[in-house]
Amino acid sequence: MELKKIMESYSQCGQDIFVYNILNKNNGTFLDLGCYLPKNINNTYLLELNGWSGISLDIIDYSEEWKERKNKFIQQDCMNVNLDELLDSNYDNKVIDYLSLDMEVLGDRFKLLEKIMETSYEFKVITIEHDSYLSEDYVNVEKLPQRKLLKEKGYILVCGDVSQKQYPTLFYEDWWVNSKYFNEEDIKTWFSDKLSCDTIFNKLNINYNVNAISEKW
């Protein structure tokens, strides 16, 4: 696959660059759970600029800040939302291009991931935090259960234990793809383990603006 080059990231770790390049499409769809602010440290703003659509949820009310975004923000505790109702009322297709999942309470990410996997929806790319650098509890309660579940559901871990450029040994996130929607040769080229995002992008020959990313961390 000829990867498309994206210059600027608004994500904490270049997740938006990764997603846009491997899917290589405009007008995709996303679901952002634990979305935080509308632009800085946001995984879907770059995608929106390229025609993507979707919904973003956060327990904190950022509705005033999100008025500048085209896509819908919902102030909601993701742990208590009716996912089937939420997804059915906002998506026409059962296949969503991108899921971004970032909850703050230990154990919540895996619990929410379980609920998502019980719905009739699936995703082409998933980025999910596990924060395993914080303690062994995060390894046992988040990272390992997340990996077991997603592998059982047919997802492939292409970038495990991703870290930020500034903190290359603080591994906090995994990047997954759905094996149904990518060919085996492409998937092989994306594999990495315990690498910082800038190293991953260099390996994939993706050009990007380092300052644009680092200024937002």
Which residues fall in each region the model found?
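SAM cofactor-binding core of SAM-dependent methyltransferases
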Residues: 5-84
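Conserved amphipathic alpha-helix within the SDR
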Residues: 85-91
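Helix N-cap/coil-helix junction residues
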Residues: 24-25, 59, 91-93, 121
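Juxtamembrane luminal stem/stalk of type II transmembrane Golgi/ER carbohydrate-processing enzymes
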Residues: 1-7, 212
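Conserved acidic-Pro-Pro-aromatic motif
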Residues: 44-53, 66, 71, 92-217
